[in-house]
């Protein structure tokens, strides 16, 4: 008998055995499945007998003391005064929007005595990133702005209780609502090319089917699968070359190498306004800058309630005790006007910390000086505070993920103030509105699509500052690529003076090249923030 014939017979026998085995397995599986189905039906029958249609327990607190609700039934009800709140105190590090909101909710809903609330601020003015002041020697300071929309539920809930400083008897929400009803926001020119020509993006995303699928894939990816992933790990030119990406990255200051998880969270947060993204019709803005329209009313409300603002107080560390699986804040270490001090905490003390900020470590320049030195994470400030806290336990997070690579996370802005009619005529030509009416002007940023810096600029309702002269127009300019040579000014933005940044902006709004230098030097005043 040949080896070949032995092999064939063996294979046939093996196949037969497999077939028999499969048959036995199928019978067993059938019996098993039948038993399982019977058991499942018995369980379902018992559950059905015990089931009652009810909402009892629906709003019970979970293990974190939180429960979820919807509708507006609970939104307008005043909470009962918490037991023991009169014995409690709160220490809030920083005086930005988040910190002031925490203090306001403690006063209004927590019914904590204002004198028991302490706001510790390193600067000599409240507001944090929500700044907006007039420096007589350098010009207007405004490092950014707030883009708001209908579904800022917590913000609107708060500001319905904050009295307006402009309209007696009204709240900040009232005046804001009336303003945006009478003067709704939208852009008439979202992007330009060729020195001030309308790019005619015309409200379209110009996304291919493949690009749409790349965005959807990111949208449905689990958060934990996005850790340490970049946007460019998910998107290619199908997205990056689209107008959708132009709108998105300039509106939210995203770079291709930024966090894919952050990108996903932003999409989820604003997906309901995707139709209003191209022309900013989804957005609403305040009358003045964010400091005068939002921060000051909150500060006045808190001061009237007796809340203590302690300026020139830099918090350097919060020392924790680890006991029975809990992390308990025991000591606040701070520097008050150059003197080291500590605040000892008890079980009745609450501590709130803002751990990080996109405007922390800002360096400034002016019209004739570039920002001095490289932007870096300083040895003080909220990044360093977070680092000191994180050293005590890995569960306090990883601040270096957010501030460890300055070259990949910096961006630069400038405020340019002018009253020159020639410049203002070019502004009118692009935004199709008169910037001196007090109404919406650009309606959001205008992005220079072919700019090497990816320069964008915006003009909000004027005057943007209460002290601003009627003939002045204040422009906010910002760029994402600070280390690339400009198109008119052949040097990186981060090396430019305010005059040079102004010149680059004038070039992109269509000012004749032979007039740019003189107008930038003598007809504008600028202040830089990086």
Tell where the protein language model's regions lie, with residue ranges.
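Rossmann-like flavin
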Residues: 164-272, 284
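Glycine-rich Rossmann-fold phosphate-binding loop(s) that bind the pyrophosphate
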Residues: 94-96
